[in-house]
Swiss-Prot record:
Protein name: Steroid receptor seven-up, isoforms B/C
A GO BP annotation: glial cell development
Residue ranges of domain NR LBD in the record: 307-532
Any one GO CC term of the record: nucleus
Role played: Receptor that is required in photoreceptors R1, R3, R4 and R6 during eye development; generation of the ganglion mother cell-2 (GMC-2) fate in the nb7-3 lineage, coinciding with the transition in the expression of HB to KR in the neuroblasts (NBs).
DNA-binding region: 197-272
Gene3D superfamilies assigned: Erythroid Transcription Factor GATA-1, subunit A (3.30.50.10), Retinoid X Receptor (1.10.565.10)
Alphabetical list of InterPro entries matching this protein: NHR-like_dom_sf (IPR035500), Nucl_hrmn_rcpt_lig-bd (IPR000536), Nuclear_hormone_rcpt_NR2 (IPR050274), Nuclear_hrmn_rcpt (IPR001723), Znf_hrmn_rcpt (IPR001628), Znf_NHR/GATA (IPR013088)
Expression across tissues: Expressed in several embryonic tissues; dorsal vessel, oenocyte and fat body. CNS expression is dynamic and confined to temporally restricted subsections of the NB lineage; expressed in many NB and GMCs, but only a small number of neurons.
Biased composition (Gly residues): 122-141
Length: 543
């Protein structure tokens, strides 16, 4: 056990009361007063009882203690005086140990002199730099803890200053701080340089980071997010191959969004936020489509989602004539004749083509894409229209319309035709069993029309986005209009793949051979698209 500083021999305690503290101002001298050098006789060896704390005092002159060398000078009164001044100065100003001492109580000169020789004999005039060589390199950190118990009785302020002395009142030395800051600045600089060297994959501007799966600038990031969140659809005034770079990226929004998707920016990475209540309708983006006042059938309760409801409204208004007008061609409770069946079939096909020409976004596609889409899906649209108007499908009139009664044929061919008629009837009846309303039929036809399975499409990405828009509209409509049928949307979508089981050749043979003979339906579809309103069939009276 070490001797307590207050009871050690030769130690003068000016305040023997318990818990008393002594600060630099309690000494009673002016701060600017000089420190006198004591006579040589004042310096003596420390008592043996304190040897555990003052082991450095036994070192002879010129001894190097710790990592700091004395330069061979030993312990001198002048060096100790400098250390005394540094210790007392610590109480007033912690960060510096370089200044000269000021003021010392003459009554404790001998007591401090018995403890201070344990410090290194060199000058205390500098910070410990960690070099371990040269005079004046600072107080040895290894002996600051040895001096700590002896100075404790003189006040808590001096204790704090002595604790901070070995490291210069900090956790690191100036040299280590400099090295650390230099390494950090170099690392951060290399990171900044690496970011600055990455270009936006869309326009080539400086990238601000990875957004939605790719490195892009802030402009392209905001443009892509805005386009996806609002389901915006653009049109190109050129050949849909506009240059997208830093100087031309704002000239064509269609080609810019197309390049964003082409370079790998993901739609699903954009978080769906709230659509602003003042969002412009579809009529603002496509002036040729005007929404009349009032909601069509099935849209009245769809007010919470104005954008999707407007889209469905446009799909419904694109019908060339109301569904109720189909009833004029049918005779209730009676089997339709051959002429009535052919007339109704012609109207259904013509209605599908005219509807496609008037719905949003389809006329903006290239003519080659329009023809390719309708050639592929015309039979599916025909089945949907047949189900929507509750077209009667009796076997005998269908066989008669196909001309199978007029010419003898093999039994296996008749059986095959009967199977195709049965498949056609099943698809129509399954759709009718779901009680699909007009808005749902319009969305289903849009989903069928905007397919990417057609060959030779020039803009697959844009067509796919239109199909996704139609699916979103149908899903939201089913959720709001049929809240008690959570599986309705899924059931409707599952009916679409089955529509392709109905052979287009069979439909053509059953309904159109009497009208066009051997002319392919695909040729008629192209003529209807290119002729505008001048196209007419013999079974298309004015409605």
């Amino acid at each position: 056990m070490c001797a307590s500083p207050s009871t050690a021999p030769g130690f003068f305690n000016p305040r023997p009361q318990s818990g008393a503290e002594l600060s630099a101002f309690d000494i009673g001298l002016s701060r600017s007063m000089g420190l006198g050098v004591p006579p040589h006789s004042a310096w003596h060896e420390p008592p043996a009882s304190l040897g555990g704390h003052l082991h450095a005092a036994s070192a002879g002159p010129g001894t190097t203690t710790g990592s700091v060398a004395t330069g061979g000078g030993g312990t001198t009164p002048s060096s100790v005086a400098s250390q005394q001044s540094a210790v007392i100065k610590q109480d007033l100003s912690c960060p510096s140990l370089n200044q000269a001492g000021s003021g010392h109580h003459p009554g404790i000169k001998e007591d401090l002199s018995s403890s201070l020789p344990s410090a290194n004999g060199g000058s205390a005039g500098g910070h410990h730099s960690g070099s371990g060589s040269g005079s004046g390199s600072g107080v040895n950190p290894g002996h600051g803890s040895d001096m700590l118990p002896l100075i404790k009785g003189h006040g808590q302020d001096m204790l704090t200053s002595i604790k901070g002395q070995p490291t210069g009142c900090g956790s690191t030395t100036p040299s280590s701080q400099a090295n650390s800051s230099h390494s950090q600045s170099s690392n951060s600089g290399s990171q900044i340089d690496s970011k600055q060297n990455i270009e936006c994959v869309v326009c080539g501007d400086k990238s601000s980071g990875k957004h939605y799966g790719q490195f892009t600038c802030e402009g392209c990031k905001s443009f892509f997010k805005r386009s996806v969140r609002r389901n915006l659809t653009y049109s190109c005034r050129g050949s849909r191959n506009c240059p997208i770079d830093q100087h031309h990226r704002n000239q064509c929004q269609y080609c810019r969004l197309k390049k964003c998707l082409k370079m790998g920016m993901r739609r699903e990475a954009v978080q769906r936020g709230r659509v602003p209540p003042t969002q412009p309708g579809l009529a603002g983006m496509h002036g040729q489509y005007q929404i009349a006042n009032g909601d069509p059938m099935g849209i009245a309760g769809f007010n919470g989602h104005s954008y999707l409801s407007s889209y469905i409204s446009l799909l419904l208004r694109a019908e060339p004539y109301p569904t109720s007008r189909y009833g004029q061609c049918m005779q209730p409770n009676n089997i339709m004749g051959i002429d009535n069946i052919c007339e109704l079939a012609a109207r259904l096909l013509f209605s599908a083509v005219e509807w496609a020409k008037n719905i949003p976004f389809f006329p903006e596609l290239q003519v080659t894409d329009q023809v390719a889409l309708l050639r592929l899906v015309w039979s599916e649209l025909f089945v949907l229209n047949a189900s929507q108007c509750s077209m009667p499908l009796h076997v005998a009139p269908l066989l008669a319309a196909a001309g199978l009664h007029a010419s003898p044929m093999a039994a296996d061919r008749v059986v095959a035709f009967m199977d195709h008629i049965r498949i056609f009837q099943e698809q129509v009846e399954k759709l009718k069993a779901l009680h699909v309303d007009s808005a749902e039929y319009s969305c289903l036809k849009a989903i069928v029309l905007f397919t990417t399975d057609a060959c030779g499409l020039s803009d697959v990405t844009h067509i796919e986005s239109l199909q996704e828009k139609s699916q979103c509209a149908l899903e939201e409509y089913c959720r709001t209009q049929y809240p008690n049928q959570p599986t309705r949307f899924g059931k409707l979508l599952l009916r679409l793949p089955s529509l392709r089981t109905v052979s287009s050749q069979v439909i053509e043979q059953l309904f159109f051979v009497r009208l066009v003979g051997k002319t392919p339906i695909e040729t008629l579809i192209r003529d209807m698209l290119l002729s505008g309103n001048s196209f007419s069939w013999p079974y298309l009276p004015s409605m």
